[in-house]
Every structure is written in C-alpha cells, then in structure tokens.
Amino acid sequence: MMDNINFEFSNASQGSRLQLQQQPPQPFNLQDLNMIQYNQPSSPWTTETFSGLTPYDCTANQSFPVQCSSSKPYPSSFHPYHHQSSDSPSLDQSVSMIPMQPLPDQYMKPLYQRSCSNDFAATNASSASYSLSFEASHDPQELCRRTYSNSNVTHLNFTSSQHQPKQSHPRFSSPPSFSIHGGSMAPNCVNKTRIRWTQDLHEKFVECVNRLGGADKATPKAILKRMDSDGLTIFHVKSHLQKYRIAKYMPESQEGKFEKRACAKELSQLDTRTGVQIKEALQLQLDVQRHLHEQLEIQRNLQLRIEEQGKQLKMMMEQQQKNKESLLKKLPDAEASLSLLDPHIHSPPSPFLVHDAEALMLTSYEDTQLQSTKS
C-alpha cells in the first residue's frame, strides 16, 4: 500500500518518459468530478478490453460519491491525473504541458499494484480504453468502476471492499460479483436436491403425520424430526405435506356423487315411510289412551256405587240389630204377663219364639232392600 502514487512508464525505444509528480495540496471538489478522457495511443491491452478484461485497476479508499459523464470533457483545473503523450501533437500545448499530479493524502489513498513491463506510450493507434475503479473503504455502497471504450459508454459496477480480497494483477482477476442492497450482501440461493419418495418413505411420512394429529396439525419441522432420514430436508417435507393435504381433501369423483344422490333418495323415501308408520302408531296409542281413560271413568263410577251400597248395607245391619234387641226385650214381658194369668203353669220358653224373631228380621231386611233398589 502506498500513500503517494508515482506512475513511471519508460520506453527504451523512443526514450520518452512520463512521470507523476506530487504537488502541494490543493482544494479539490470530488462531487464535480467528470469523466476523465484520455486521448492516448492504443495499448497492448486494447484487445483485452474489448474481450471484457480490464488492463489495470486503480482503487482509492474514500467515501464520496462519484459523478461520471461521458459527454463533457474533464476540466484541466480539476484533473487528479493528467498526462499527454509525446506522440499526440493534436492536443493543446497548454494542456499537454500540465504535469500529472496526484490527489493529496487526505482526499485519496490509492491502492495500486501492477507489474509494469510494457511501454505505455510506444504503441500507435487511434483510440485507447482504460478502466478505473474507485473503491470506498468506509462506505461499501459508494464504489464505482468505470470503463471507457471507443463508444464513450460508462459502465458502473458497485462493489464492497470489505468483502473483496485485494487483487495483484487485473489480467488474472475477474470483476466483482457482489451486489449490495441496503448495505448487506445478498446470499446465494441454496441448490435444492430432488429426492424420490419411495413407498417405504411415504408410509413413514404418513405414520409420522398420524402421530402428530393429522395433516392439519402436523408441521414440516416436527415431521422431519420424527422421520430422521438422511438427505431429507424441510423443503422436501413441506412440499410433500402440501401434496398430501391436497390429495386427502380432493373432491369426490362423479361416481361417488351419483351414489350419494341415490342413497339420499332412498333415505328420503325411507324417512317418508317411517314417518307414516310412526304417525299411525301414535294415532293408535292415542286411541288406546282414550279407551283406557273411559274405562277408568267407568271403574270410578262403579267404585262410587259400591261404596254407596256398602254404606246402605251397614245401615241395614245396624237397623236389624236394633230390631232384634227390641224383640228380645219384649219376650220377658210376655212371659211375665203369662205367669200372672196362670201362676201354676211353669212352662219353658218356647223355641218357636226365637225362630219367629229371626223370620221377622229377615222380612224387615228384604223390605229395606226393595226400598233401596226402587230409590
């Protein structure tokens, strides 16, 4: 790494020498920097330039934006490096006499490594193409590589010095391929390898899915952990799980739809028949309940009549008992009257009197029974 740049190019055949001399620091506005135009003879690297290779690279560690323009010449007062070949007499003498001066250290710290063994000004051609790339060490987004060709088309390529190794020679180096988005380097896509889902592997997958609660609850990460197969990644499991869900919840075929419709018709007819039968059974049940209610009413009336008859029988028995007691009371009185009439006759009580009393009681009972039936 060098703080000051001294470009020295020697040509033994023509004896011309071009040397960069360091000048005192001058104010330099890099934002107004335009395209540096070189009108030099062709170099040995012209073929390489047209082939897509850069003849040499110059790098400068500075964090500043560079504005490039291919239509306006670079003013001589702001040339960081300006030189004129001795073989080109068409340029202005005042411009050609201005020596090439490098930028001060505080503005630019160029990194340049080149093994210079060829002459820079010894070749004869009408145009030359050079490549100049500035690399920002502090801000990786402000790196610009500019390539100048005969068509004066400017090509910009933004690179980051933090991720690029230093190149010793541009001829054996390739242009940077990093692209910066928001200060970070975009990672390369991982190549996905395809695998063949065999029957055993699929059965193992289905078993893991069922253990995890079905296709809806299973996750690719859990399935991959349970399967534990070599060469199987989460991308394979995720894709296969999606296909498995689609196949599981695929709509039924037309055959299945027709069968389903036929079953639905049969079920509707069966439901109609069953409804009619249930209705008839309910009607019969209502009729039976009505008959039972009528029978219960009849039994209730009979029970009431039986209770009334029992009360009447009880009253009749009580009346008969009273009549019997009254007759028994009358018998001693009759015997006493007979003894008063004939005291010498002591005859036992006649058994016919008791029989007569019973017959009397029966007749009285029959009379009361007839009266109750009539009423």
Swiss-Prot record:
Coiled coil segments of this chain: 279-299
Region (Disordered): 159-178
Domain HTH myb-type: 189-249
Keywords: Coiled coil, DNA-binding, Nucleus, Transcription, Transcription regulation
Subcellular localization, as worded in the UniProt entry: Nucleus
GO molecular function: DNA binding; DNA-binding transcription factor activity
Family matches, as SUPFAM superfamilies: Homeodomain-like (SSF46689)
Disulfide bond positions: none
Gene3D superfamilies: Homeodomain-like
GO BP annotations listed: regulation of DNA-templated transcription
DNA-binding region ranges: 220-245
Main localization category: nucleus
Signal peptide boundaries: none
Gene Ontology CC: nucleus
Motif (LHEQLE) on chain: 292-297
Pfam short name (any one): Myb_CC_LHEQLE
Polar residues bias spans: 159-171
Family: Belongs to the MYB-CC family.
The protein, known as: Myb family transcription factor PHL5
Protein's organism: Arabidopsis thaliana (Mouse-ear cress)
